[in-house]
């Protein structure tokens, strides 16, 4: 969950936002906007599996949060015409939890595990035989009466999603036959997503308004939809506005403190702290986090990725450094020693 004040967070804010996301989800690949190479590959794999009347190979989806990994898993289930059971790595605390999930699956069904990198080791190891040979062995009883019991499983598809693919063990990663990296979205795709969501919300929006929202959405559909939802409120109370136009978008996002590149107040504070107190860097992540009053993990997971992707920051062996692009965006002069 994310701080409600951070409108550009890629994480889900609360249960209400999660329910809104569900209402906006596409149901089939043809409705899914963006990620074209992945869609093309998956359409081939799905069609082939259906022709052979087999379950789809196991799928690993990895990439930054908010890009639609869960949505894509739902779409795959719809395209395959099977049921999907959803859970998360932290929710499967012990082998018995996994057994209960697997026991509910029918042939061809999908088990979706979000944050799969957070599975306990003992649960992960049980998955190996389930994924590879469709069986699990569990020990029943205790002490001298303990004995293994062999449980065959119906053929199923495991879809794992993670924002931290590097934390997956090699044995688990190697058991996924289909591995797809989800990248940040292009502005044109985000604009199309905003227009589609506005239509679902029954909200009139000008093309230039949708384009501006897309520009400030950090390449992330979840952020685009959240900004649209907030801006819709401004449009509905604004006099003499029958649609979300560019003026309303600019006004709303200025009040929300989201700048032209999608940076918010904390992003700006991070860059300005590095410039004002550390001459632009290099500065260590722990030091930087302490200076802006955030946890180190929060800075690494929530703030740094987008700043790196936009080229405002770079990593060096000695720490983080503000780039010339970062200085330029802030309207600051880069010192000669940088």
Swiss-Prot record:
GO terms for biological process: DNA recombination; DNA repair. The keyword Nucleotide-binding applies. ATP binds at residues 24-25, 66, 69-71, 132-134, 175, 185, 222. Keywords: ATP-binding, Cytoplasm, DNA damage, DNA recombination, DNA repair, DNA-binding, Hydrolase, Nucleotide-binding. Its main location: cytoplasm. Pfam families: AAA_lid_4 (PF17864), RuvB_C (PF05491), RuvB_N (PF05496). It catalyses: ATP + H2O = ADP + phosphate + H(+). InterPro entries: AAA+_ATPase, AAA_lid_4, DNA_helicase_Holl-junc_RuvB, P-loop_NTPase, RuvB-like_N, RuvB_C, WH-like_DNA-bd_sf, WH_DNA-bd_sf. This is Holliday junction branch migration complex subunit RuvB. The gene is ruvB.
